[in-house]
Amino acid sequence: MTHAAYPAEVPERGYRYLGDEVRRGKQFPRAEVEAAIARYFELAKHGTTTGDWNPWADLFTDDAIYVEHSFGVLHGREAIRQWVTTVTHSVPSDLDIVGQWYLIENDVCAVYTPNRRPAPDGGEPYQFIGFSVFIYAGDGMWCYEEDLTNTGEIQRVNAAHADAARPAGNQQ
Protein backbone atom coordinates (compact mmCIF):
# COMPACT_ATOMS: atom_id res chain seq x y z
CA MET A 1 0.00 0.00 0.00
CA THR A 2 1.34 3.49 -0.85
CA HIS A 3 0.30 7.05 -0.07
CA ALA A 4 -0.84 9.28 -2.94
CA ALA A 5 0.94 12.48 -1.82
CA TYR A 6 4.40 10.99 -1.28
CA PRO A 7 6.14 7.73 -2.21
CA ALA A 8 5.88 5.79 1.07
CA GLU A 9 5.09 2.11 1.33
CA VAL A 10 3.05 0.88 4.29
CA PRO A 11 3.82 -2.81 4.85
CA GLU A 12 0.64 -4.85 5.21
CA ARG A 13 2.35 -7.38 7.49
CA GLY A 14 4.01 -4.79 9.70
CA TYR A 15 7.42 -3.20 9.87
CA ARG A 16 10.78 -4.93 10.06
CA TYR A 17 14.28 -3.57 10.59
CA LEU A 18 15.68 -2.36 7.25
CA GLY A 19 18.92 -0.74 8.40
CA ASP A 20 21.15 -3.57 7.26
CA GLU A 21 20.07 -2.93 3.65
CA VAL A 22 21.97 0.39 3.61
CA ARG A 23 24.52 0.04 6.40
CA ARG A 24 28.05 0.81 5.21
CA GLY A 25 29.93 -1.39 7.70
CA LYS A 26 32.58 1.26 8.41
CA GLN A 27 34.02 2.51 11.68
CA PHE A 28 33.58 6.21 12.50
CA PRO A 29 35.06 8.36 15.24
CA ARG A 30 32.48 9.09 17.93
CA ALA A 31 33.11 12.84 17.62
CA GLU A 32 32.19 12.71 13.92
CA VAL A 33 28.91 10.93 14.65
CA GLU A 34 28.10 13.35 17.49
CA ALA A 35 28.73 16.31 15.17
CA ALA A 36 26.37 14.75 12.60
CA ILE A 37 23.66 14.33 15.26
CA ALA A 38 24.05 17.98 16.29
CA ARG A 39 23.84 19.08 12.64
CA TYR A 40 20.72 16.96 12.09
CA PHE A 41 18.86 18.68 14.92
CA GLU A 42 20.19 22.10 13.90
CA LEU A 43 18.73 21.60 10.42
CA ALA A 44 15.48 20.17 11.82
CA LYS A 45 15.17 23.44 13.79
CA HIS A 46 15.82 25.34 10.55
CA GLY A 47 13.05 23.33 8.88
CA THR A 48 10.48 24.00 11.59
CA THR A 49 11.27 27.71 11.91
CA THR A 50 11.52 28.53 8.19
CA GLY A 51 9.49 25.81 6.45
CA ASP A 52 12.56 25.03 4.32
CA TRP A 53 13.36 21.37 4.86
CA ASN A 54 15.77 21.04 1.92
CA PRO A 55 19.00 21.35 3.96
CA TRP A 56 17.66 18.70 6.37
CA ALA A 57 16.71 16.35 3.51
CA ASP A 58 20.18 16.81 2.03
CA LEU A 59 21.61 15.08 5.13
CA PHE A 60 20.37 11.75 3.74
CA THR A 61 22.21 9.62 1.20
CA ASP A 62 20.68 8.94 -2.22
CA ASP A 63 19.92 5.36 -1.12
CA ALA A 64 18.70 6.19 2.40
CA ILE A 65 15.77 4.38 3.96
CA TYR A 66 13.47 6.33 6.27
CA VAL A 67 10.88 4.39 8.26
CA GLU A 68 8.18 6.57 9.81
CA HIS A 69 5.73 4.18 11.45
CA SER A 70 2.89 6.71 11.14
CA PHE A 71 3.49 7.27 7.41
CA GLY A 72 5.39 4.36 5.88
CA VAL A 73 8.78 3.44 4.41
CA LEU A 74 10.57 5.94 2.18
CA HIS A 75 13.40 4.99 -0.17
CA GLY A 76 15.94 7.64 -1.15
CA ARG A 77 16.69 11.26 -0.36
CA GLU A 78 14.17 12.67 -2.82
CA ALA A 79 11.34 10.55 -1.40
CA ILE A 80 12.28 11.78 2.08
CA ARG A 81 12.28 15.38 0.81
CA GLN A 82 8.87 14.94 -0.85
CA TRP A 83 7.44 13.38 2.32
CA VAL A 84 8.70 16.05 4.75
CA THR A 85 7.57 18.94 2.55
CA THR A 86 4.16 17.29 2.12
CA VAL A 87 3.51 16.61 5.80
CA THR A 88 4.79 20.02 6.95
CA HIS A 89 3.26 21.86 3.99
CA SER A 90 6.61 23.75 3.96
CA VAL A 91 5.09 26.10 6.53
CA PRO A 92 7.05 27.34 9.55
CA SER A 93 5.83 26.09 12.92
CA ASP A 94 6.61 26.50 16.59
CA LEU A 95 7.54 22.81 16.95
CA ASP A 96 10.96 22.27 18.50
CA ILE A 97 12.49 18.85 17.77
CA VAL A 98 15.14 18.16 20.40
CA GLY A 99 17.66 15.34 20.62
CA GLN A 100 17.58 15.12 24.41
CA TRP A 101 19.92 12.14 24.76
CA TYR A 102 21.46 9.52 22.54
CA LEU A 103 23.41 6.29 22.53
CA ILE A 104 26.07 5.64 19.91
CA GLU A 105 27.46 2.27 18.91
CA ASN A 106 29.84 3.06 16.04
CA ASP A 107 27.50 4.02 13.16
CA VAL A 108 24.19 3.26 14.90
CA CYS A 109 22.56 5.92 17.05
CA ALA A 110 19.46 5.71 19.23
CA VAL A 111 18.02 9.14 20.03
CA TYR A 112 15.30 10.15 22.51
CA THR A 113 13.50 13.06 20.91
CA PRO A 114 10.91 15.25 22.63
CA ASN A 115 8.88 17.23 20.09
CA ARG A 116 7.86 20.40 21.93
CA ARG A 117 5.50 23.28 21.33
CA PRO A 118 5.51 26.30 23.63
CA ALA A 119 2.49 26.74 25.88
CA PRO A 120 0.36 29.71 24.81
CA ASP A 121 0.25 30.84 28.46
CA GLY A 122 4.02 30.59 28.86
CA GLY A 123 3.82 27.51 31.10
CA GLU A 124 5.28 24.06 30.57
CA PRO A 125 5.57 23.13 26.88
CA TYR A 126 3.27 20.65 25.19
CA GLN A 127 5.30 17.69 24.00
CA PHE A 128 5.17 14.22 22.56
CA ILE A 129 8.07 11.82 22.57
CA GLY A 130 9.82 10.24 19.64
CA PHE A 131 12.49 7.58 19.67
CA SER A 132 14.66 7.23 16.58
CA VAL A 133 17.31 4.87 15.29
CA PHE A 134 19.83 6.34 12.84
CA ILE A 135 22.65 4.81 10.83
CA TYR A 136 25.50 7.13 10.00
CA ALA A 137 26.95 6.84 6.49
CA GLY A 138 29.96 9.14 6.88
CA ASP A 139 30.66 12.64 5.58
CA GLY A 140 27.91 14.09 7.80
CA MET A 141 25.19 12.01 6.11
CA TRP A 142 22.64 9.45 7.26
CA CYS A 143 21.61 6.33 5.34
CA TYR A 144 18.85 5.21 7.71
CA GLU A 145 16.33 6.66 10.11
CA GLU A 146 13.46 4.91 11.84
CA ASP A 147 11.07 6.98 13.96
CA LEU A 148 8.87 5.48 16.64
CA THR A 149 6.12 7.69 18.03
CA ASN A 150 2.72 7.20 19.60
CA THR A 151 0.19 8.69 17.17
CA GLY A 152 -2.46 8.76 19.91
CA GLU A 153 -0.15 10.87 22.06
CA ILE A 154 0.63 13.19 19.14
CA GLN A 155 -3.07 13.75 18.41
CA ARG A 156 -3.93 14.29 22.08
CA VAL A 157 -1.06 16.75 22.68
CA ASN A 158 -1.72 18.68 19.45
CA ALA A 159 -5.44 18.93 20.28
CA ALA A 160 -4.67 20.15 23.81
CA HIS A 161 -2.23 22.72 22.41
CA ALA A 162 -4.80 23.93 19.85
CA ASP A 163 -7.45 24.25 22.59
CA ALA A 164 -5.04 26.23 24.78
CA ALA A 165 -4.18 28.53 21.87
CA ARG A 166 -7.81 29.49 21.17
CA PRO A 167 -8.98 32.74 22.73
CA ALA A 168 -11.07 32.29 25.90
CA GLY A 169 -14.75 31.84 25.08
CA ASN A 170 -13.98 30.45 21.61
CA GLN A 171 -13.48 26.78 22.52
CA GLN A 172 -15.16 25.02 19.58
What role is predicted for each listed range?
Residues 84, 97-103, 115-116, 129-135:
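Hydrophobic/aromatic beta-strand elements that line small-molecule binding cavities or substrate pockets
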